[in-house]
């Protein structure tokens, strides 16, 4: 029989008492009262914050949105099919955060920054709050650098600057996404990080966009945030903030960034759905009262920072879909009033074959003219006025039978200018190409070219200049000004090519 000495027992007890660490965890726990339609009503979360993350028993995460007297309304960021009435809910004490860093570039992530492209985990070291305050007045500087879209109609008449918010608005199937994708493709070699946020779109459409960007080599500097139509409404309304947060990280590192929200109409609809399910009082068109703030706090995060903060910028191109051209609806008017201008796409122009279908008459860029390159400003100064006069004359000429020679010439010039502004999808033009195309139209070099051959002439001319007059392109790219030497080279190039074109035609 083993004999146990009392002093040994007391020593063991003493050691265990000394090693004992009191680890008390206080957690804020509640109970699910009701769950369904992506919303959970929770009782007992007394100390929860507005916007705090809460965790359900099955691992689903939600956000506390409605803090009422007797319960908390939480929106679910997952399916939540395993959540049962009476199950526990724990407040995490954290606000929603998004992983950020260089590892995101070239990846496709969901509405919370989690990878969904099947390329494995991302090694991100930093994270930022999903909702963060916009830069203040002192932190900003005015827009002065151009953000070239590569689309002649936009860069010449509705210029965009780095740090600007420019709305792209139009009916469905008018080429809104095409303009955004062309702008991303045109940033190749410009050291701009692009973020494309797809909200409530079909997965096949997003896959098509990814394929286009990959084919054009644009995925190397682009992050795609996709909250697809099949995702919960909560993720669809949070996705734009995720995109802004990712771009913000690069902006505060001193980089130029471009964010495209495609589109904010669907985000507003997702937010309306969530708000109505939370029983928030509906307002105009059944949207909640804070739907303006939903978009203003997002778009105000786009800015051009001052040099003390690194001089980074975030340019925002939000997209809004109108119904039958009605820009006076609630969401379109809200976003028009928040942004620094709008590019209006007309379904009539689109159906008539003028693509991109930019309606220059009602499109405007409020701050972009300060950022427009001098070369474009010099050659395109008159183009908007000429097109406006042409549109007026065209309407008048339908009723008048005999037109004088000057009017006929003006109509012919206007038709050719319109041809210059036509552009195929996914083929943005460089700055020298835009300068050459507009210069040849404004200065009458196309007047004696048959209208049906004008587009072919411009395409051939741009190729000829790139191959035979490379110095012209170099001067425009480096100087950003149409110097006398560049103008001489351009005139020579146009004259030489025109002779060969007319002979072959």
From Swiss-Prot:
Q: Does the keyword section mention Transferase?
A: no
Q: Where is this site: Required for activity?
A: 363
InterPro entries attached to this UniProt entry: ATP_synth_asu-like_sf, ATP_synth_asu_C, ATP_synth_asu_C_sf, ATP_synth_F1_a_nt-bd_dom, ATP_synth_F1_asu, ATPase_a/bsu_AS, ATPase_F1/V1/A1_a/bsu_N, ATPase_F1/V1/A1_a/bsu_N_sf
Q: Which family does it belong to?
A: Belongs to the ATPase alpha/beta chains family.
**Species:** Trichodesmium erythraeum (strain IMS101)
Q: What does this protein do?
A: Produces ATP from ADP in the presence of a proton gradient across the membrane. The alpha chain is a regulatory subunit.
This enzyme catalyses: ATP + H2O + 4 H(+)(in) = ADP + phosphate + 5 H(+)(out)
Quaternary structure note: F-type ATPases have 2 components, CF(1) - the catalytic core - and CF(0) - the membrane proton channel. CF(1) has five subunits: alpha(3), beta(3), gamma(1), delta(1), epsilon(1). CF(0) has four main subunits: a(1), b(1), b'(1) and c(9-12).
Report the locations given in the UniProt record: Cellular thylakoid membrane
Keywords from the UniProt entry: ATP synthesis, ATP-binding, CF(1), Hydrogen ion transport, Ion transport, Membrane, Nucleotide-binding, Thylakoid, Translocase, Transport
Main location, first listed in the record: membrane
Question: What molecular function terms (GO) are annotated for this protein?
Answer: ADP binding; ATP binding; proton-transporting ATP synthase activity, rotational mechanism
Q: Please give the GO cellular component terms listed in this UniProt entry.
A: plasma membrane-derived thylakoid membrane; proton-transporting ATP synthase complex
Q: Which Pfam families match?
A: ATP-synt_ab (PF00006), ATP-synt_ab_C (PF00306), ATP-synt_ab_N (PF02874)
Kindly give the membrane topology term recorded for this protein: Peripheral membrane protein
User: What protein does this entry describe?
Assistant: ATP synthase subunit alpha
Task: Write out the residues that bind ATP.
Answer: 170-177
Enzyme Commission number(s) from the entry:
7.1.2.2
């Amino acid at each position: 029989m083993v004999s146990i000495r009392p002093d040994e027992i007391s020593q063991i007890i003493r050691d265990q008492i000394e090693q004992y660490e009191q680890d008390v965890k206080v957690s804020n726990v509640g109970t699910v009262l009701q769950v369904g339609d992506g919303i959970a009503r929770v009782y007992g979360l007394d100390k929860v914050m507005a916007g705090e993350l809460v965790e359900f028993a099955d691992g689903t995460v939600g956000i506390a949105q409605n803090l009422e007297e007797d319960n908390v309304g939480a929106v679910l960021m997952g399916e939540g099919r395993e959540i049962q009435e009476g199950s526990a809910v724990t407040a995490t004490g954290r606000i929603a955060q998004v992983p950020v860093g260089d590892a995101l570039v070239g990846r496709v992530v969901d509405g919370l920054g989690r990878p969904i492209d099947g390329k494995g985990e991302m090694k991100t070291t930093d994270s930022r709050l999903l909702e963060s305050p916009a830069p203040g007045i002192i932190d900003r500087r005015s827009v002065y650098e151009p953000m070239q879209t590569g689309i002649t109609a936009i860069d010449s008449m509705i210029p965009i600057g780095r740090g600007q918010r420019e709305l792209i608005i139009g009916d469905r199937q008018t080429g809104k996404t095409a303009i955004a994708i062309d702008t991303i493709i045109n940033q190749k070699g410009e050291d701009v990080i692009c973020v494309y946020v797809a909200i409530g779109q079909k997965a096949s459409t997003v896959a098509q966009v990814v394929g286009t960007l990959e084919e054009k080599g644009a995925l190397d500097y682009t992050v795609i945030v996709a909250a697809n139509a099949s995702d919960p409404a909560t993720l669809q309304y949070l996705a734009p903030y995720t995109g802004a947060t990712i771009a913000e990280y690069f902006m505060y590192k001193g980089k130029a960034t471009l964010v495209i929200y495609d589109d904010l109409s669907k985000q507003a609809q997702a937010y309306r759905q969530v708000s109505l399910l939370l029983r928030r009082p509906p307002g105009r068109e059944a949207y909640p009262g804070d739907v303006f703030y939903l978009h203003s706090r997002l778009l105000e995060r786009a800015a051009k920072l001052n040099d003390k903060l690194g001089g980074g910028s975030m340019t925002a191109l939000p997209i809004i879909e109108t119904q039958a051209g009605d820009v006076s609806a609630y969401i379109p008017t809200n976003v028009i009033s928040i942004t620094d201008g709008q590019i209006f796409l007309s379904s009539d122009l689109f159906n008539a074959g003028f693509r991109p279908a930019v309606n220059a008459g009602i499109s405007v860029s409020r701050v972009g003219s300060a950022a427009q390159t001098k070369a474009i400003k010099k050659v395109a100064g008159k183009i908007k006025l000429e097109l406006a006069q042409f549109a007026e004359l065209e309407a008048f000429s339908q009723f008048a039978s005999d037109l004088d020679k000057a009017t006929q010439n003006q109509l012919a010039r206007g038709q050719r200018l319109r041809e210059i502004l036509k552009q195929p999808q996914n083929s943005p033009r460089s700055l020298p190409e835009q300068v050459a195309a507009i210069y040849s139209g404004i200065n009458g070099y196309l007047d004696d070219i048959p209208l049906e051959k004008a587009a072919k002439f411009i395409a051939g001319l741009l190729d000829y200049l790139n191959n035979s007059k490379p110095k012209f392109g170099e001067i425009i790219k480096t100087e950003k000004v149409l110097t006398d030497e560049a103008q001489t080279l351009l005139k020579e190039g146009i004259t030489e090519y025109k002779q060969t074109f007319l002979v072959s035609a």
